[in-house]
């Protein structure tokens, strides 16, 4: 199974990305927020339709720059809004939480780190409680905000601006993979314990993350791909 993660679309198409999807037999696209640039919401359906033309499933969460109504727009476009939710897909379990910790810009999708921590903790704890002893499973946490003090939340001047509310439950539950975004310049792969954390950067810059999962063993590779 092949899963692609993208982030920070900001209302701009990338035709090379659609071409990549059509040429590489991708099963699922995970969208880590900021689909729009403070709107308009009409772009969501336009964007999702382009993805569906590539014969993929799509799950998405909002970013801090997406306006109120974004989850309804995602659903109306025929996609799953994974914000504050979890779902099984093949031999993966994917959990999602959108928005970001506070920024200097007072954007629509901001919330406190305490609230992010409580919400992400509950998602990871819910899966941990359910458990799965019958077959190998890959756990993916999809967030817009990156975990604090990592390669994926670092501004060019070296300041770390990610979310403690994302980082703390990752430490506690160790999901296999965290896909995030938000900090456009921080395209990188890092580790928090056993968790692989990846920020593929803005879609328009021509990168995505590819997760290639063995259907039988659930062994996986995580790579940032240039298209």
Regions found by a protein language model. Name each.
Residues 1-53:
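N-terminal active-site segment of His-dependent metallophosphoesterases
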Residues 1-4, 86-96, 134-140, 191-196, ...:
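Beta-strand-turn-beta hairpins that frame and shape the catalytic cleft
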Residues 5-8, 29-34, 57-64, 81-83, ...:
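Active-site neighborhood of phospho(di)ester-bond hydrolases with catalytic His/Asp-centered motifs
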Residues 10-16, 36-41, 64-71, 87, ...:
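Active-site environment of divalent metal-dependent phosphoester hydrolases
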Residues 17-20, 46-50, 119, 162-169, ...:
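A general structural detector for well-ordered alpha-helical segments in enzyme core domains, enriched
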Residues 53, 59, 149, 154-215:
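Conserved beta-sheet core of the metallophosphoesterase superfamily
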Residues 66-162:
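Conserved catalytic scaffold of divalent metal-dependent phosphoesterases
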Residues 222-227:
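Short, solvent-exposed aromatic-acidic interface loops
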């Amino acid at each position: 199974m092949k899963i692609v993660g993208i982030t920070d679309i900001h209302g701009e198409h990338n035709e090379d990305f659609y071409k990549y999807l059509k040429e590489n037999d991708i099963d699922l696209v995970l969208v880590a927020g900021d689909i729009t640039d403070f709107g308009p919401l009409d772009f969501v359906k336009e964007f999702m339709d382009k993805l569906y033309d590539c014969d993929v499933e799509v799950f998405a969460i909002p970013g801090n720059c997406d306006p109120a109504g974004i989850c309804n727009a995602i659903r109306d476009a025929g996609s799953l809004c994974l914000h504050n939710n979890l779902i099984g897909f093949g031999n993966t379990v994917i959990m999602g939480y959108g928005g970001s910790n506070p920024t200097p810009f007072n954007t629509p999708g901001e919330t406190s780190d305490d609230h992010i921590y409580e919400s992400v903790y509950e998602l990871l704890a819910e899966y941990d409680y359910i458990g799965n002893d019958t077959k190998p499973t890959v756990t993916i946490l999809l967030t817009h905000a990156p975990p604090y003090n990592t390669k994926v939340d670092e501004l060019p001047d070296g300041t770390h601006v990610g979310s403690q509310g994302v980082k703390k439950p990752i430490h506690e539950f160790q999901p296999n993979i965290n896909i995030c975004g938000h900090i456009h310049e921080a395209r990188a792969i890092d580790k928090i314990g056993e968790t692989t954390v990846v920020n593929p950067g803005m879609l328009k810059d021509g990168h995505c993350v590819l997760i290639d999962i063995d259907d039988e063993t659930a062994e996986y590779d995580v790579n940032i791909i240039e298209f």
